[in-house]
Amino acid sequence: MIFQRTVQKMVKSTGVGLHSGNKVTLCIMPAPVNTGIVLKRTDLSPAVSIPAKADMVRETTMCTALVNDAGIRISTIEHLFAALAGLGIDNAIIEVDAPEIPIMDGSASPFVFLLQSAGIKEQAAAKKYLKIIKPVRVEDGDKWAELKPFKGFRVDFRIDFDHPEIARSQQHMVMDFSTSAFVKDISRARTFGFMRDIEYLRANNLALGGSMENAVVLDEYRVLNPDGLRYEDEFVKHKILDAFGDLYVAGHAIVGEFSAYKTGHALNNQLVRALLAQQDAWELVSFDKEADVPVSFMVPGALAHV
């Protein structure tokens, strides 16, 4: 049987909130089987827990935010969720003492490191996969996103930015998911933004924690970061990273192909909601043998060496 996973022990880290600019402490803890991913605001009294479900994503402007019925929010979850998805973590309690997850370096890599430091433990329950059996597609103008049947998890993603630096880079990527491919080729890709937008956001008390320490910043012509890019195609890779995180609020690893053109947090979430609403388009499956699993998650003991 292929088992569910959680972390072996609690792990904690501190970073900066992208929008507030304030210090944020994050704590990732083990959780029992079938818990899923639950986020908890410990700065509130009493503390408030929000399950990571598609219908709890109620804001997608510049990030993905979970918001409960009382309006309590936890923002910027997507990079952490990409790491959870990439390492195949099914169950975890994530405590945070602020209304946002720390931005860290703008990628998923610090969260991958945290999860590897905590260790990954298999649990005595079958891991469930969300298998796509009929295509589901959402559109917004010329932007679109689609999930369709595929034996594995494949991503086919295209961006289209009218900027000389991005135009010079590869704006289309196809990848077959595996933990090692995610960690090596995707997880280090940072969020990116334009100087003109950052100035506007700061004038409106947003992105106060944003800097070249946690984002690729571009002016009208070039990348301003002194060290340049981590990957030649870092822009499209970061959009794929975001999509991994956004899709994980479906609650399970997906078996299927995700194709997208110019999509972002809003359309990604619309796709997950449309999928879950169309109950004949998917089924939950589990596997008895490693050889039968179409999505390759590295065994826990090997993760530390990726």
From Swiss-Prot:
Metal-binding listed as a keyword: yes
Pathway: Glycolipid biosynthesis; lipid IV(A) biosynthesis; lipid IV(A) from (3R)-3-hydroxytetradecanoyl-[acyl-carrier-protein] and UDP-N-acetyl-alpha-D-glucosamine: step 2/6
Pfam families per the UniProt record, alphabetical: LpxC
Entry's Gene Ontology BP terms: lipid A biosynthetic process
Residues noted as binding Zn(2+) in the record, renumbered to the chain: 79, 238, 242
Catalytic activity: a UDP-3-O-[(3R)-3-hydroxyacyl]-N-acetyl-alpha-D-glucosamine + H2O = a UDP-3-O-[(3R)-3-hydroxyacyl]-alpha-D-glucosamine + acetate
This protein's UniProt keywords: Hydrolase, Lipid A biosynthesis, Lipid biosynthesis, Lipid metabolism, Metal-binding, Zinc
Example GO molecular function: metal ion binding
InterPro entries found in the cross-reference section: Ribosomal_Su5_D2-typ_SF, UDP-acyl_GlcNac_deAcase, UDP-acyl_GlcNac_deAcase_C, UDP-acyl_N-AcGlcN_deAcase_N
Active-site residues, record numbering mapped to chain: 265
Cofactor(s) essential for the protein: Zn(2+)
This enzyme's EC code(s): 3.5.1.108
Record's function text: Catalyzes the hydrolysis of UDP-3-O-myristoyl-N-acetylglucosamine to form UDP-3-O-myristoylglucosamine and acetate, the committed step in lipid A biosynthesis.
Record-stated family: Belongs to the LpxC family.
Protein name: UDP-3-O-acyl-N-acetylglucosamine deacetylase
Species in which this protein is naturally found: Shewanella frigidimarina (strain NCIMB 400)
